[in-house]
Amino acid sequence: MNAKLSHGVCLFLLFFVPLSGLPNPAQTSATETQAVQVAMKNVTYHYTEPIVVHIVRLEGELLPTNPRALVVFDDKSSFTLALTSAEIAISCNALAQVLNENVFSFAGAPLKDLSIESKNDRLIVKGKLRQKMDVPFETTGTLSANADGRIRLHAEHVKAAHLPMKGLLDLLGIDLARLINTNKVRGVTVEKDDLILDPEQILPPPHIQGKVTAVRVQGNDIVQVFGTPQASNFAAKQPGNYLAFRHGDIRFGKLTMHDADLIMIDMDRRDPFDFYLDHYQDQLVAGYTKSTPEYGLRVYTRDYNQLRSRPTTSQPGKR
């Protein structure tokens, strides 16, 4: 092994402890694991290949779902993203995909084949009523932030089979509205002529915690504002696009970083940082790493959409 490579390996090992040398956290710690502070700027985040959101800015914490366990990048169910402040945009197409795949995908779901488009500051939602012989429907409405932090879609115009209806309840009927308002349909409820969406429940893992304080239609995107904008964050001096993590413990692959000081930096600042947690390892391998005098890591990361060979399936162990 040449001297340069040997020196690099030694530096790398200073930051990490191999998993084989770690006791089982559930057996060794009787105290709660410290939350990991997180900040993001201008990130295109993939929940799945088609379900993508644009994180304009974000400050919050990664909370282990098991208080005595670690945040594990290879297990999206191991943590929740608690938002202190964020601005996140999701396209109409991506939201329709979320509703079709995550909310109304179960056998007997009342709605199917949903599509969403924007017109001026309105949303147009189309679909079929499964329990009414797949009758097509269309509703046009406005968005607002509910007092409890959910999103309210107020239906102004409703049609079924191209015929105007009095309102959403007239379209659905009492029985269908009651079916939507059960625990079978996660994150969606009906209140009179309004459809209420809960971002905490409708999105795939990793799940978020946070209250929507404002929402608007901007072009083909639905822009959600969570919390109150912060004056600064711990990574504010970092230029460009990034995902930053500080404090707490993080495990990824065979390595664990204690008292984390990790920033993943976009190698191409010309567009948003395209990041897919299911394939973070492929993105890391395509980049390079630098260490800081304070034992932190700065990982210059390739955009997912710029990988030469895009993975076709998730890596083993992804959940």
Where are these regions (language model features)?
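Bacterial N-terminal signal peptides
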Residues: 10-18
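Bacterial N-terminal signal peptides that target proteins for export
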Residues: 1-9
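Short, intrinsically disordered, low-complexity terminal segments
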Residues: 5-6, 20-23
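Extracellular/lumenal and peripheral-membrane lipid-interaction modules
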Residues: 24-319
